[in-house]
Amino acid sequence: MKNKKALFIPLFIIILFIAFFNKIINFIINIKWFKEVNYLAVYFTKMRAIIILMIPIFIIFFISIWMYYKSLIINKNKSVVDIGLNKNNYGKKLFFIFNFIVSIFLAYIFSSSYWYRILQFNNSVDFNVKDPIFFKDVSFYIFKLPLFESLYKVIISLLLFLVITTFIAYFILEAKYKIQSRKDINLKNINYGIKSFAGKQLAIVSGLIILFISFGHLIKIWNLVYSSNGVSFGASYTDVHATLLFYKIIVVITLISSIVTLLSIVKGKFKPVSICIGITIFLIVSQNIASFLVQNFIVKSNEKTLEQPYIKNNIDLTRKAFALDDIEIRDFDIKNDLQKQDIADNKASIDNIRINSFKPTLEFYNQVQIIRYYYTFNDIDIDRYNINGKYNQVFLAAREIDTDALNPNTWQNRHLIYTHGFGAVMNKVNSVTSEGQPDFVIKDIPPYNKTNIKLTNPRIYFGEKTNDYVIVNTKINEFDYPREDSNKTNKYNGHAGIKMSFINRLLFAINKKDINFLLSKDIKKDSKIIINRNIVERAKKIAPFLTYDSDPYMVIYNGKIYWIIDAYTTTNRYPYSEPYDSINYIRNSAKVVIDSVDGDTNFYITDKKDPIVNNYAKTFKGLFKEEEDAPKEIREHFRYPKDLFSIQSKVLGKYHVKDPGVFYNGEDLWEVSKDQKHVEGETNTNDAPYIIMKLPDQNKEEMVLLNYFNVMKKDNMIALFGARMDGEQYGKKILYKLPSDKTVYSPYLFKQKINQDTNISKELSLWNREGSKVQYGDTIILPIKNSLLYIEPLYLRASGKNSIPEMKRVILSYNDKLVLSSSIQEGIKEIFNSKDNKINDKNEKDSTKTIDDSKLKKAQEYYNKAIEAQKNGDWTKYGENINELGNILNSIK
């Protein structure tokens, strides 16, 4: 028997090890990886918190269960129920083991579930904003109330569980006793049996349940700030004047009832307990009836007047929660009185008008610049660079390896050879080639670079498509990039990766379920495995509590490619703030910068005023760095994120209204303008463009994220909403309100204006014939002083699966003028009736000569193409090129 007991503990440990084997392996690998990326302390924050919490919670559970058990044992000796445990210590030992296991299990479940809320509670940071009903700082609702709610749910659940298990234990032991004594089970004596077995214990538990019902209603009081019963989010008139009153009464009555219950137990009287429970139930029912009566017989007929203070609370706090309370609001009185000098003064804005559009450009990149089938461009980013001394807006994209496209897709190819992407492409947004394609300033492999931007190490080991692990510094050379005669190879010289010792090879073989880690003869001791290479997943693994933007973007700095990911702090706990997309508070409080070669991942705090990110910084020490610690050249490329701007625009459509009466009437609602991508195509919500512009009253151009607003369910544009991002202006928002008594064309109305123009419509119909299709580019509405300039690139796509859209024309509109032109410059000249190609250029003669030379060169290109088409018998192409030649010759007359 002793030998069996001696074997039990080792056997139990072995079973536990087998059951948690994969988790143990994963835990070891996580330690190695977090150590490699220098965030081991962040990883251990959770573990340390769980262990520290488990110890006192285990002691509380263990002692509480043991004391409850002991009290039942004492009652057992006075009861008819004989559980047979007093004759030896076996039952006590068995219960001790049971109690130990249950207490550890419950302590672990509680600690692993609520460690984060407890740390949030301990590291609470004030918002310095108080709710208007209970005058508590917002931090109470975000950092403290969630813990109170969790504790309430856990304790109530445990108390109810205790009641249920007590009844179950009684019935089991009673049945056992009856069977052993061969007596019949008498259901009539159950009431007496329960009282004698656990009457006082159950009464105490009932008193505690009533006590926590009181606490639960106190939580309900605080949760009134999230009420959705009124016309706006947050506590309404009925909530404050009826529901709140009854909740307070219930809190007091249930608190008294819990005390009465405990005193009644001591005196052995149970009638007062029944009375207290009855009163509590009556009050809960009465609260619902009273709230219904107040809402329907007092509020309903006077709602606008009675609800105004609460609507104002909702407006003020929603605007604060979504960072809309600091918007600079200006009237934009459209005069359309631009002169040539105004055009000259805004030359940089006009020179940066985007005629390349996202989707067609990405298609072109993926057909012309992937070089080999195993490369891909995941998406296109837009940014601003000083190129050869000029401030330019550009498109750029990283050329990544698409491992799913490899052929053959072997383990060596996927993980040892094709380890990284190579290079980037860049084109200015404002220029195209004579064929209507993006005009590259960086392209090809190895990079052909016409800029002053250095790109000396263009390898991409970490990116948006790098979803697999790779093993570097093996006996096989890594593929670097293709050449005509042979492939260029490379050895990884970065510091990322975990050394592949035999133990680590074994660990990863188990973790990845791949025997190749052990069988491969190419892996050396100095080889390293690089895991978690997807930049978003990498950031999430380090800081899973942040929300990440859907569009990471690349930056070229110090000869390498870096990735920037916007990280958000969000909550749905901000009082009185109306939820949008399941959140009612958001800040872009951090930027994540990731090195594409070394994988260095840095989190920079960009909003020091945000209490949530400061709470994270206190909780996860060593995670965040100051924004000033980021290189200046990286900071210059920080963008105002589109995901944040999108949700702010959605909220602003309703919450630009500050007057509660107007808000109640719903008479001034906005929505983001609609747009149309195809002639006679479906309409979609306009995608806010990043544009280079000079804001009114500013003396230099800057990059601005701009959205266009319509009146709800109308197409007339009513406002322009912009977010600034250059230098010290970063994060400043401005709202231009357009005159409501004028028809201001939105992107959609602009498209309708184009379709209704007989000359342009005729051209579009001609191009949109069978075999080709016209599609619109990205609509830009550019404010210049007190005027609006509309720009619409036109793309022509030939039939065929792999056809590439070409930017053939630009439509410009100003005031009542609408022109179809081959370029922005030509369109501006036509609108303002100037014969100069560059308006107000001081060196008019030289600039005209330069432009004439460039046009003559284009004319020669079209002439050569026309002759070539004539030789091939392609008369359609011949006609197109002759038309283009004619346009150019007409423009330089």
UniProtKB/Swiss-Prot annotation:
One of its GO terms (cellular component) is plasma membrane. It is found in: Cell membrane. InterPro entries: UPF0182. The chain crosses the membrane at residues 9-29, 49-69, 94-114, 154-174, 202-222, 246-266, 273-293. Its main location: membrane. It is a multi-pass membrane protein. Pfam families: UPF0182. It comes from the Bacteria. Coiled coil: none annotated. Keywords: Cell membrane, Membrane, Transmembrane, Transmembrane helix. Belongs to the UPF0182 family. This is UPF0182 protein CLD_0809.
